[in-house]
C-alpha cells in the first residue's frame, strides 16, 4: 500500500505495527524477539521499495507496551520508537516509561 508514496511523503510517514492479539485491555504483549523480528521484516520491505530513503521512515511498535517491556523493546535495532496506549492514561506511569527509555541511552 505504500508503493505510491513520493519522496516528499516518505519523510511524513510513520509505520506502526501492533499484533492483533496484543490490542486492548486483554491484549497479550508480544515477546521482544517477535516484535524485533517483525520490525526487521518491515525495515527490509521498506528498503526493497525505497532503497536507503526508507531509513528515514520510523517504525514504531505498539501492542500492550508497559513498564515491564518498554525498555527491552526500545533498544531493539529495528524498533524506532513505541506507540503506547493504556500506560499513557496515567501521567506518572507514562513519565516513568519515558524516563526508563531515555535512561537506556538509545535512539
What are these regions (language model features)?
Residues 65-78:
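Catalytic cores of alpha/beta
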Residues 48-54, 104-106:
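Short helix-capping segments at alpha-helix termini
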Residues 88-107:
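C-terminal helical cap(s) of enzyme catalytic domains, especially alpha/beta-barrels
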Residues 19-23, 65, 88:
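Active-site-proximal loop/turn and secondary-structure-junction residues that shape catalytic pockets
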Residues 7, 37-49:
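Alpha-helix-loop-beta-strand connector modules within alpha/beta enzyme cores
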Residues 1-9:
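Single conserved hydrophobic/aromatic residue that forms the stacking wall/gate
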Residues 27-38:
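Alpha-helix N-cap and loop-to-helix initiation/capping positions
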Residues 13-17, 55, 59-63, 80-84:
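Hydrophobic faces of well-ordered beta-strands that scaffold small-molecule active sites
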